[in-house]
Amino acid sequence: MASVLNVKESKAPERTVVVAGLPVDLFSDQLLAVLVKSHFQDIKNEGGDVEDVIYPTRTKGVAYVIFKEKKVAENVIRQKKHWLARKTRHAELTVSLRVSHFGDKIFSSVNAILDLSVFGKEVTLETLVKDLKKKIPSLSFSPLKPNGRISVEGSFLAVKRLRESLLARACSLLEKDRNFTSEERKWNRQNPQRNLQRSNNSLASVRTLVPETARSGEMLVLDTDVFLYLKHKCGSYESTLKKFHILSQEKVDGEITTICLKSIQVGSQPNNAKHVKELIEEWSHALYLKLRKETFILEGKENREKRMIKRACEQLSSRYLEVLINLYRTHIDIIGSSSDTYLFKKGVMKLIGQKVS
């Protein structure tokens, strides 16, 4: 099965573009690959000869298109708006696609929902969103909701940068709050209850965004699938934490996971947490390039079929020890190498009496 590794092995990253936003629920994987190739071979779309289309990939709705010429890839990216059109019996479907450069450190498109209300009245939220758009222009922001929530979409690295920017801002506000509270207590002791309530509310809202560990340790953000595989299938994660006496505080939030690392042994080396952070980043990057995810949809299926799929996954789990199986109410994710996930999926489909698409 095709994977992002094909791009690296073909030595063609400069001729490759990442295409996100494919309508995965409307067409089969095979048809989508054909539609994508046809779209990017059309000169009206600044396209040209396509060497290969890598789809499906580990990330839902994302394909890699390798052109025969570097110039064509550059032209495709220069034309920022791409519309994938498909005529059906009743209507013509048009879908907006997002294209970007491929790089060794590429993390495909992810979505995240932010709750900016934790900043309270410290900043005007509209101004904050404008600043974020200017700072990270590659991200797409939805309109800000009255409750302070906003959704963002973009590459994993861009979302990671956004999260770190917000955490840094929150830490700064927290420090200002502390300084303000200290000064206020010196001159305003006539209404201590009001003063205490005001400072506590402000501090509490910001603290919900900034984990205690992050203020005194090391923080990193990972792709959730990569993190789960690293934690449950790579013994080096837990053994390294134990070896360097590091406490790991993990928060899974959709497609991204935040990890805060802190030394828990008195007298241990001060750089231990930083060293462990670097090791985890190294491992996660290698895994991101190696891993692939397949998904079995349970939602909408009859209970009998759901049970058959679950039983098949359980039956094959002892044969594929390097495949991680994550069971959810609506679906089952299997994560592993490209060959393992393909063979695992093929085995499940055979056990439940279906053909591999």
UniProtKB/Swiss-Prot annotation:
Gene3D superfamilies referenced in this protein's UniProt entry, alphabetically: 3.30.70.330
SUPFAM superfamilies membership: RNA-binding domain, RBD
Annotated keywords: RNA-binding
GO molecular function: RNA binding
Domain RRM: 15-104
InterPro entries reported in the protein's UniProt record: Nucleotide-bd_a/b_plait_sf (IPR012677), RBD_domain_sf (IPR035979), RRM_dom (IPR000504)
Disulfide bonds: none
PANTHER family named among the record's database cross-references: INTERFERON-INDUCED PROTEIN 35/NMI N-MYC/STAT INTERACTING PROTEIN, RNA-BINDING PROTEIN 43
Official protein name in the record: RNA-binding protein 43
Protein's organism: Homo sapiens (Human)
Lineage per the UniProt record: Eukaryota, Metazoa, Chordata, Craniata, Vertebrata
